[in-house]
Amino acid sequence: HQQVVLGNAYLQDFFFPGYTAEFVAAWNKDDPSVHYDDNGFLVRPAPIGNVVNEGPGGGPLAHGIRVGYFGWLGSGHIRRVNLTHAFYQAVGEDTFNPVAGRRVTVNAQMAAAELSYDRDWIRYRISTFYTSGDANPRDGRARGFDSIVDLPNFAGGIFSFWNREAIRLLGSGVSLTTDGSLIPSLRSTKEEGQANFVNPGIFLANVGADFDITPKLKGFANVNYLRFERTEPLEFLLFESPIRHSIGEDFGIGVTYRPPLSENIVMTGGASALQPGAGFKDIYTARTLFSLFGSVKFTF
């Protein structure tokens, strides 16, 4: 179904010593197809909006992606301040976007940056994350950014409720967010579904800290403020207006423990919570959502 071509170029000591720049070009060609997951649910095309052609011949409508990504990423340090950043521009087309109900051209952006400072055994972090959103879900321009596939260790990573928990969109066959992603992409699944560039986008601000308690034990604390960049796609799909922009505050704590001081055994545990903002309350609930989790990974 899908073919991806990726090219990277790295430049060390770019601009200043200790900073490495990475320039990325990627091409995502995801052909139209019909696919059901192991539980028998339709995931390609995404079961939302216009899916079936009701004209002569019938059948699912062709939803194909032809999108190029161009990115500038970097990591390094300026004296004692650590810097990590990324910017992506996505351009191309979707042959038939189910939300827009038509062919759309893609023009979307993503930006992220993190500054951190090490003091003794603690690293203090501030970061921000942004993806553009679509202000008019039915026109011919798709401005909501979506990735090919992502698993960001950013803004709390797996210790963030928003990042870890897949949140289903009410009354639909898609998710507001998929597990392991910060982007409210409105796609069926990250692994089996297709990218969707008609989505609300997001703005995130983060503060946190990492604690090297012992060489084997590391702790994490994290607070995020989340906000939809646009809400028009949600208002259109849910037949509800207005939906406000604030998603809420996301709190997370956790630890990782490596008994043999290697990656052979990694034990992870934590707790996270999402305190809904006005926009999340408009869609779901005003109750605080909680998550407790733990895992053990063996690598040999």
Question: Locations of the language-model features?
Answer:
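Signature for the C-terminal beta-barrel architecture of outer-membrane proteins
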Residues: 1-142, 203-207, 212-213, 225-229, ...
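Short proline/glycine-enriched turn/loop segments at secondary-structure junctions
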Residues: 261, 281-286
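Outer-membrane beta-barrel "beta-signal"
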Residues: 253, 287-300
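C-terminal structured "cap/appendage" subdomains that terminate the fold
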Residues: 246-276
